[in-house]
Structures are given as C-alpha cells and as structure tokens.
C-alpha cells in the first residue's frame, strides 16, 4: 500500500509538472529529473562531443518507469487515518461540469413530439421490431450496444474528481463505435435516416442524451454525413426544433474550454510570419479537421499564420509521388521567396505535420528561414531510417524543434536522439508521453493523467513558444538590439541598420542561405522613403529618390512628430527653459561686450565655440576617411568627429539684380536672378552624415515669429547687390538695446529662436535615418562667391569648430555707405575672435546629437539668415521644401544629408 501510495503521489506531481504552463508556472519546473538530483559529477547534456547543438530532451507527460520491488513484506501497514487530499484538476471544474451536462439539459429538443410522455426505463421491451430487415436489426443492435456501454461508464464515473475528463473519454469511445456501425452499412441514406428517427422516438432520456453526445462529437468530424442523417427528423420537428438541435450539435464540449480561452498563447517577439506546410495535396472534398483548425487558431496568437496549400491539376491524375513531393516543396519555397520580397525583415517560421515537416526541413536548406517546427517528424522512410551520409537534412543550419510521440511508429525517441547528434543546426526535442505519430494520446493516458487532447495540444504549443522565443530573441540579438516589434520598428529605425547587422549574422552560420535583407541596395539619397515599403503582393519594395510634395511632407512631418514620443533618450538633452536661460545669460554677456566695441565694427560676429586645435585622434580619423573612395557602413555608436560644425549663410534680398543667378532649391519659387552671399567653414568627411538646420527670415507679420528647422537642407536664392548687406543687418538689429523699432528683430528673439531650433534638432536626431550615400562624398563644400567677397574665403576652421552668428546692435553709419567698403568691414568682422571665450560658456550646445541612439555626431550645421526689403522680418519656417538639387551652383551639399522635421 505504501508503494502504491508513493506511485500515485509521484504521478500527481508529474502531472502537475507536465501541465505547469497552463498555470503560467516556471518552465524549469518541468526539468526536475534524476540528473539534477544526482551527484555533482553527473555529466551535463553537452558532454557528448557530437551533442554540442542538441538541446536536452523535454518530456511531456512521460511517466518514469519504476521497477517493482521483489521483496514481499509479510506485514503491510495500512494507513486508515491520513486523509489524502483531492488532486486539483487542471481545468475549471464548475464550468466543465456545466458543458458536460449540456446535452442532458436540452435533450427535449431532439424529440419529435415534445408533448408525448417520455419512454419508460424498460423501453427496449416496448420497441416493436416487426417488419425490420436483417440490416436494420444488426445496425440497431450495434448502436444500442455502444450506447449501453456509454451509459455504464457514466454511472461508474459519477462523482469522481475528474469526472469531466472521464466523461469526455467515454463519449469519444461511444462516438467511434457509432461511426463504425454506420460505416458498416456504407452510410446508406435511407437506413441511417430510419435509424435516427427510431432512436429519437424510442430511447429513454438518459440514453438519448448519450446518443446526442455521440452525434455532437461526430458532427465536428464528419459534418456532411451527420447533416444527411438528420434531414428526416428536421422535417418532423419543425424549424424551431431543427435550429435548436443544430445549435446543440454545433461543437463538441471540452472540459478545458475555460482554461484554453482565458490563457491564450503570448505573441512572439518580432511579429514573425508562420508558414504551415501541407502534408499532401489539398482537396475540397476533405476539409481540415477540427483539431487542425484549433491548432491554426492557437498559432495565430503567436503571429501571422499563412497556410501553404498544394493544388494538383486534374485532381492529381497522372502525377507520381516524386512529382507531387517536388510540387509541394516548390510551393512552400515560392511562398518563402514571395514573403522575402514583400517583407524582407520579417522572421519566417516553417511548421509542418508529418510529411509537411520533411517539406519544411528541405525548404530551410534551400532558403533562409528563422526556425522550423516539425510535428510528428517521420524518421523512418521507405529506404530505411534517416541520418545517412547523403541525407540532405544533415546540412541544416536553421534551428529546428522536433515534437514526436512516445509511441510513434515512424520515429522512435532513441533513434531520434542519434539523428539529432548528426545535425549541426541547433535543435530541440519534445517527447509527448503516450502519443502516436499525430501526437494523439491514448484513452488510457487520458484517464491516468486526467487530460484531454486539447490540453496536450496546448502544452505542445507552449513548448513551441518557448523554443521560438529563444530563437527569435537570439536572432534579434545578432542584429544588435533587444526584442521588439518589427512592425513599429520599421518606422522608427531605417532598415539599412538591420541590413548591415544581418551581414555579420549570415557568415556566422556558414552555408545557411543568406537573409534577403542583406541583398537590398543601399538608399542612394541617404534617407529611406517609407512609401517604398509595400505590402501589396503585386509590388516589391525598392528604395527610390523622390521629390516630396507639400502634402507628402506634411504627412511625414506628422509621423515623425508622433514617433518622437516613442524614442527613449538615454542622454540628457537641453529642455526648453534651460536653453532659454543659457541664451539669456549669453545675450547679457554679449551686450556687455557690445558696448565696448568701436563704432565701425560690423553687426555680425562669427564666434568659434572651441579655438583649440583638433586632437590627434580626430586628425587621424579625418585622414583615414578622406582616403576612402566610398563610404563604409559605420558601426552604431561610432563617430567621425567629436564636434559638429556650423555653416553660416548670409543672404540678402534686394530689388537690384547683378551677377550670376543661384538656382532655387526650395519647392516654392523664389525671386529669380538672386545671388547669395554664402560662406562655408570646415570640411565634409566621406561617409559622414550632415545635419543641417536652417533659420530663415521669410515674409510674415511681426506677430507670428515662428521658429523651426527646415525639413530639407536648401539655400534659398536671392537677388542681391553687394550693398544689400547693410540693409539686411540694419533690419536684423535695433539701434539701441532699449528701443524697438517696428519691423526690427532684436538679438534676443534671434538667439531665442536659435535655442529652439537647436533643442529641436537635439531631440529629433535619434529618430532620423542614418544611411550613408553609396557614391563618393565631396571632401570639402565648395562655395561660389562674388568677386568683391573673395576675402571671405580666408576664414577656415578645423573639423572640430562650431561657428555661430551673433547679431550686435549698431547703427547704419557704422557699416559704411559704399559697396567698396563692405568687404573691409566684413573682413574685420570675421577675423575678430574676441568672443571665443564667451561662447565656451555654452557646453551643452556643443553636443546636439543623441549619441546613445546609434547615430553619428553631425558634422555640419547651416544657419541661414535671409532679409527681405520693405518687409517686417521675423523668424519663420521656410515653407515646403523639396529634395536638395545636386546641380546647384551656389552651394554643393554632401549627398548623405539628413532631413529634419520642423519643430512642433
């Protein structure tokens, strides 16, 4: 008795461990076998030299074998005092009993005459068999015998702790016997309709409930034959009774319906696409079974499920087995290639049953997939077991999970272990105790373990989730990021980053087929158009350079502002008030220095942020990058220079035109025949990204004063004579600090606008695409200047210098009135470095890029100040911009530019 009690306790604990995932328990609880409880010198699972890629076998509901004790005790103690606790069922007992008695509660719906008294208990003696044929008598006796066995099982299991499971097993057994009896008469329509009418009229209520349970089970398996059987009774009971009976027989009940409906499988990371390979040619005559539909609905919780059906011409007439197999493999392979073309960065998981598992393995050898799940893998073939030297499956590089039954005829667990040792790919094995080739457990196993087939299927699905979660997490770890949703990630992060990272994942796997993400060309414009991502089956994604219209740009602006909220910034950035406070202090010091300047000083001072020479490491980086003829793919987090540069452009607009015209780079037409006065400082290194922010003064009223960064780097053309610079600078500043003239913008508002734009640039750089240009980048930005202004080219700085434009209040008389005197004043203005120390008080603005996001520090920032005659000048957005034109004669920008969305 003690041995039997210990065996029962062990089975109870094993059953709880086997279904621990139904209670959301730890996975490691299931791995408590004797090896973990043995001595410390027990060999681990990876001690075998050939088992480096084979993970330990997971056992589901496998009862350990224990040898019976040979010694017979004379005195066996019997414990009559200890109360054994009732084992907790693995389902909601109350809900299971409710669905279990559903047919008994609604048995009246099946009777043709509801008002007639129910048949007595001895109904068999009252059955009139006069005129029955031999076939009718034999069929009736077979059905009656099956129903009597079910009735006895119900009475025997009544009141048991796991009565719903035992009832389910008995109903399935009765349904199988009824189906065999009906098949013995070849489902003769007249005979089965006569049988159904006779049983409904003569059976007692308990026996009729058992008969309805059997019909309910068969309706889910063979709905067409059952509908043909119920035609005669539906005409007698009427429309209401027929509808009630149809609803009752709609689906078979399951004790675990509550557990399975409330505990859905969790979604896999990366939003994978799950392809189900068919086990044979599909046919409309044989619809998918209820169990396969349950599997497909459960797998749809993990990701997008795409069944791959194989259709043969002329119903497969004249098609051999080898041709059919080649057709099946070709269908799955073409579907994989189609998905790769439409969704190149989506993980693909192949799942197959039996022969479909073999098809999935063969496709994984030829095409790139993330993982393969083989359910009921057939190891034995016509030519013998698999695993020979010439077996193509030994070349698999894709992680694979094998799920087999303990009692499988086509795959023995020990032979499967030998086969796993020969595979170089990462593989795992799950053995389902008491299951056959289709992973269906026997009735004895269901009774002993208190399980149903749906519970076993759910536990297998949990094992699949554990395996795929680990594979997908490691696959995304190779791409240099934590698990995340690829659907949202394709909007936040440019695909070229994943394209680069997949490149060093593929060589790591040897001969594994390369991911299609590594085959896509780089974007020629340095920024990827999200409109090129197409999910349509008729179009393939491709990178392209387009001229963005105003409506398209507004939609991109909205999406960029929305995505900005989801980007986590790990580095501290300047807030709005901090930037205002720093610029207020900067302005105050600027005013003190401005009062001490001589009257003839120009109204703009170019202040270098750092005047020290660049470090040796930066010079070496610059020399190496300038030697490259094409930009390489930098690793995330690397940077070419520690400090960005600012390019300053002074543009004035007047009514007079002279000199060569600068073609407009904005989408809105500007004044034709303009000539900007532009100065560029520093060099643009090859492969580096250029971050360009433009502060423009456009036509608006004095009440607007909007400040933003232009979405595209462009230089607006302007018609100038050299004398227009004085007009511009006289409008930009006030005559005295205390007075404010109408139409004049003070230095405070200009600096405040600069703070807004720089803060916006700092907060948005983490969401910008970083794609180097495939062509060679210019080593220096070339600028065309008018002849009187050639002296501006004398001012050059290193790559680590930031130059800012600071307006200083002055009068018109201090600038000189003649065009010939202006170059001298500007020369004095640019060569003056008196405010170099003053600008060093702004350390927070030197680093305006979020380096934690993986983007490089911007190398250049362009500040453009444009004045318009007879207009009130304010800081406002430039308007709708277009893609930068590379044939501009006024300013040549590097092609690897980054577009900035405007400030909200």
Curated annotation (Swiss-Prot):
Subcellular location: Nucleus; Mitochondrion; Cytoplasm, Cytoskeleton, Spindle pole
Keyword Ubl conjugation on entry: no
Composition bias, Basic and acidic residues: 476-511
Composition bias type Polar residues, residue spans: 551-562
Region of interest (Disordered), residue spans: 476-563, 608-678, 697-719, 762-782, 869-904
Keyword Phosphoprotein: yes
Modified residues (Phosphoserine): 523, 536, 540, 773
Sequence ranges of Low complexity compositional bias: 512-550, 700-719, 879-904
Source organism superkingdom: Eukaryota
GO annotations of cellular component type: histone acetyltransferase complex; intracellular membrane-bounded organelle; mitochondrion; NSL complex; nucleoplasm
Record GO biological process: chromatin organization; positive regulation of DNA-templated transcription; positive regulation of transcription by RNA polymerase II; regulation of mitochondrial transcription
Alphabetical keyword list: Chromatin regulator, Cytoplasm, Cytoskeleton, Microtubule, Mitochondrion, Nucleus, Phosphoprotein
Assembly: Component of the NSL complex at least composed of KAT8/MOF, KANSL1, KANSL2, KANSL3, MCRS1, PHF20, OGT1/OGT, WDR5 and HCFC1.
Function: Non-catalytic component of the NSL histone acetyltransferase complex, a multiprotein complex that mediates histone H4 acetylation at 'Lys-5'- and 'Lys-8' (H4K5ac and H4K8ac) at transcription start sites and promotes transcription initiation. The NSL complex also acts as a regulator of gene expression in mitochondria. Within the NSL complex, KANSL3 is required to promote KAT8 association with mitochondrial DNA. Required for transcription of intraciliary transport genes in both ciliated and non-ciliated cells.
Protein name: KAT8 regulatory NSL complex subunit 3
Biological source species: Homo sapiens
